Amino acid sequence: MAGQTIIVSGLNPAAILQSTIGGGASPTAAAAENGTRKVIPLSRDALQDFMLSIITQKLQDEKQPFYVLDLGEVVSLMDQWKSSLPNIRPFYAVKCNPEPSFLSILSAMGSNFDCASRAEIEYVLALGISPDRIVFANPCKPESDIIFAAKVGVNLTTYDSEDEVYKIRKHHPKSELLPRIKPMFDGNARCPMGPKYGALPEEVEPLLRAAQAARLTVSGVSFHIGSGDADSNAYLGAIAAAKEVFETAAKLGMSKMTVLDVGGGFTSGHQFTTAAVAVKSALKQHFDDEPELTIIAEPGRFFAETAFTLATTVIGKRVRGELREYWINDGLYGSMNCVLYDHATVNATPLAVLSNRTNVTCGGSKTFPTTVFGPTCDALDTVLRDYQLPELQVNDWLVFPNMGAYTKAAGSNFNGFNTSTIVTHLAYTYPS
């Protein structure tokens, strides 16, 4: 995995900041030459100035795109999680964004990790994180990955087919299984999971019997309502269905189950507030008689989406009457793949560092209907259409906020534009 890793420790934001910049260094000093990276402390409204400073640095002579990771935003989101869902342990979904610095600060604040492959497990273990803080949350795993999980001690895993039981029995009999059930209502999820994963109600008992016959431990139940779910009511039905699985296991004489994995689907902001209320209500209704129950979740975009900002350079321009067309050096085959695969909507803010240095944000300037293309030769590589932007020139910049979820992680190297080489800079914002 490309990129450097910072070392962070402690739950206190000040302590995290201090450890990321190196012990004893002043907040604006570069980290010691030990592989850690410089972290800049900023007020919340100074992030744009920080990005401008990066753009003007000699390191940006080639004007390559870059990310800024706001560690302060991550701390704030973790505070929200612990305040709203204090009894649910987050297992961050590594697939959403595996940036090492991001994983490090999440780990320091107590997050565990949801991994879906051997490579993701290796990312997490490389940061010194214990294997018992990982759930291997992929219901269908290659046998080689199961063998690796057994070797390194990652035991908690999901399944939703009898064939998976046979693979696990053969290669990792010490596994602790979580049958994954299919929610009957996906609640308008941006990316539904039900068509691919999850046992139907009539399949649950055979799956439990298969694990029982294989003498494997079934520790609990998991589900996932879908990524970016907009309807929190989906959790209500899923938690009720999970309770039925607990009851079925008890009727089969299986050992008492102790884990409930409520999956992902959480998005920061109002959706999270309503989701937290729905989850707590359903848990009280269906699992209030399970005081020893360990409840976990697999949030991805909740922590990642708003913590990252992407800066891109305008590399080309064409004028057709009132229409302005710009090419930038990242696009749908790179970070903006989220537009296609994650059904995301992106927004751009201009930084006219070349054409309007006295008003780089172009406040009050006339705007034009604009199309923004990515850099590849494919016409599909269109980031924005009918979008209002001011007049820009080649070597001006466009900045995209909320670009942390399923962006760089899913990018490609098509046409030789290598998404994996995009650098991430670190900042730590405080409320103004």
Curated annotation (Swiss-Prot):
Enzyme class: lyase
Keyword Zinc annotated: no
Species annotation: Nicotiana glutinosa (Tobacco)
Functional pH dependence: Optimum pH is 8.0 with L-ornithine as substrate. Optimum pH is 6.8 with L-lysine as substrate.
Positions of the record's site feature: Stacks against the aromatic ring of pyridoxal phosphate and stabilizes reaction intermediates: 224
Outcome when changing residue 338 to A: Loss of activity
Pfam families referenced in this protein's UniProt entry, alphabetically: Orn_Arg_deC_N (PF02784), Orn_DAP_Arg_deC (PF00278)
Name the record gives this protein: Ornithine decarboxylase, chloroplastic
Cofactor requirement: pyridoxal 5'-phosphate
N6-(pyridoxal phosphate)lysine PTM sites in chain numbering: 95
Enzyme Commission no: 4.1.1.17, 4.1.1.18
Entry function: Involved in the biosynthesis of pyridine alkaloid natural products, leading mainly to the production of anabasine, anatabine, nicotine and nornicotine, effective deterrents against herbivores with antiparasitic and pesticide properties (neurotoxins); nornicotine serves as the precursor in the synthesis of the carcinogen compound N'-nitrosonornicotine (NNN). Catalyzes the first and rate-limiting step of polyamine biosynthesis that converts ornithine into putrescine, which is the precursor for the polyamines, spermidine and spermine.
Cellular component terms per the entry's GO annotation: chloroplast
Pathway: Alkaloid biosynthesis; nicotine biosynthesis; Amine and polyamine biosynthesis; putrescine biosynthesis via L-ornithine pathway; putrescine from L-ornithine: step 1/1
GO biological process terms, semicolon-separated: alkaloid metabolic process; nicotine biosynthetic process; putrescine biosynthetic process from arginine, via ornithine
